[in-house]
């Protein structure tokens, strides 16, 4: 069976991930007019820039959908977002600022839940608005086939007939008007935006040029913290975790995790927390650039890692960072539910997150400027009295440290011998100044 259909399957049911925007509206109407039977599925991901979800399925029906459904994905999305925080599943960082993989998390949830809904309706052909140059086409492909082994893929943007007729936004808008729909294109922005309740992605168009900065972006989850005319009040916030799960903000508990994430977004958003500018490697190995918002994820991540460093030992923390980066890359590639990802998730959630219980108080200022004011946990292995520089009872004595240092003589001797060996082979040169060997100029060494 052919998995990817290059041309419209006339007379067959096609499920389309319907956003209500111009692209998917024109695609749905075009498919109906050409003889297919489109079904529209809209994911409620708590997008901060969406005002009326209920209106989206109604529009789909007007444009010719056989049926239109709104699928509430918010609870599952937040669950996956918290899992990513517990595992540190983030691999793209620049200058200490993190991209929280909010779009890949959204695709994992959308790609599975919408296809599951389609399968229930007897719809086994799926289309969405992802382009062939991006990451989403592969993410949706993987998650769709994982959910429904009989799934076939039809994307209007891979169909030359569709492209020839409606290859651009102007053509799509004219097509909608000619078909009797008073569809006006939204004002053209200098970049495109995709969002869910975990975060927002701004990319493409002007942002493809590195001399266009964050300053051209209008945040949808926070404030323009770089603009001195925007007033930002210093704010203290306390975040509490129990067994790796965020449970309270400023002492307030929440009926569900969705409400907690929304409040975390509001708190972090007041400061522009979690906004970053990243150059990343797409799945196809080409580099792209994005500007990201994730105020709630950033707030929870900061508090979580503060507790992590105070509770776990050095090697566990090292494994958390190493495995977290691996897992973040798998998530980015659309492999969040693959066995290798599940193995890493299980280890990190079972042995790392389960011990993270406590409370962290932060002072938030502008953007990513913050201070940690207090850290409280019954599980802390950090004990001030163990290494206090003040006089008092100590867990070990000066004689104990002398013995420990004496044991170091073994590896110091080995290291010194190796350094002299490197001098003999020409990799290092002896120094007449400070007595330490010096690395030879590589070009000079090659000529030897």
Curated annotation (Swiss-Prot):
Residue stretches in coiled coil: none
Any Pfam family hit: Arginosuc_synth
Family as reported in the entry's similarity comment: Belongs to the argininosuccinate synthase family. Type 2 subfamily.
GO biological process: argininosuccinate metabolic process; L-arginine biosynthetic process; urea cycle
NCBIfam families: argG, PRK05370.1
The protein's name in its UniProt record: Argininosuccinate synthase
Quaternary structure and interacting proteins, as annotated: Homotetramer.
GO MF: argininosuccinate synthase activity; ATP binding; protein homodimerization activity
Positions of L-aspartate binding: 131, 135-136
Catalytic activity: L-citrulline + L-aspartate + ATP = 2-(N(omega)-L-arginino)succinate + AMP + diphosphate + H(+)
Binding site for L-citrulline: 99, 135, 139, 192, 201, 203, 280
Lineage summary: Bacteria, Pseudomonadati, Pseudomonadota, Gammaproteobacteria, Enterobacterales
UniProt xrefs under InterPro entries: Arg_succ_synth_type2_subfam, Arginosuc_syn_C, Arginosuc_syn_N, Arginosuc_synth, Arginosuc_synth_CS, Arginosuc_synth_type_1_subfam, AS_cat/multimer_dom_body, AS_multimer_C_tail
Binding residue positions for ATP: 17-25, 43, 129, 131, 136, 194
Signal sequence, start to end: none
Keywords on record: Amino-acid biosynthesis, Arginine biosynthesis, ATP-binding, Cytoplasm, Ligase, Nucleotide-binding
EC number: 6.3.4.5
Top class in the EC scheme: ligase
Organism: Enterobacter sp. (strain 638)
UniProt pathway annotation: Amino-acid biosynthesis; L-arginine biosynthesis; L-arginine from L-ornithine and carbamoyl phosphate: step 2/3
Gene name tied to this protein: argG
Principal location class: cytoplasm
